[in-house]
From Swiss-Prot:
Designated name of the protein: Potassium channel toxin
Function in brief: Toxin that blocks voltage-gated potassium channels (Kv).
GO MF annotation list: potassium channel regulator activity; toxin activity
Subcellular location: Secreted
Cross-referenced InterPro entries: Scorpion_toxin-like_sf
Family to which this protein belongs: Belongs to the short scorpion toxin superfamily. Potassium channel inhibitor family. Alpha-KTx 21 subfamily.
Gene Ontology CC: extracellular region
Disulfide linkage: C6-C25, C11-C30, C15-C32
Source organism, top-level taxon: Eukaryota
Amino acid sequence: TAIGNCNPFTCDKECKTKGNKRGYCENYNCECSKW
């Protein structure tokens, strides 16, 4: 994901691929959540 731009759908998909529960955008960054 480019700096200053976060796609919530792409972020969620990437996080789930890494074994996380979900992904969300915070301060334009992709954050992964394990719960």
